[in-house]
């Protein structure tokens, strides 16, 4: 869910907090999967990689990548794509980066295909970091412990929450069909739930 639509989706994943005991293996697999994304045109069968919308988005991407390189590490991606069919659009490579805690990449909405990753010691640490941003539209968790899942649901400041959704960790709701709205600067604390009459339309 980080790189579909070139990250230009309001629910695209932009941050991943990973249990420190799994971090190295997770990053290795993430980088391998990212580098295996087909570079074919989105108009062709099997095409996945879309262009960003305009030159301003390319500039946002370029600035974010430069910041990641200056303060942290770009693990894969980080380039403008201009070969073949990429020459006629604003194509940029899906990017994975490790950046310090004070980087603005943790707290900015970029709408480009860039995912930051960080190890955490505990679920509570991950929740606190996830909540320490001005946005709260979607969040996702992969866990097998019911108590951890319950704690995440209770504490995460996000309007839409997914658990163990392999097809997209932070995306998948159908706006207009399912409740879809956010907290903080992503909405107004849950009004997208539909109010007192929302549930009745399903009865």
Where are the predicted features?
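Conserved C-terminal structural/oligomerization subdomain of aldehyde/semialdehyde dehydrogenase
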Residues: 1, 34, 38, 50, ...
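ALDH superfamily catalytic-core signature
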Residues: 1-101, 124, 128, 163
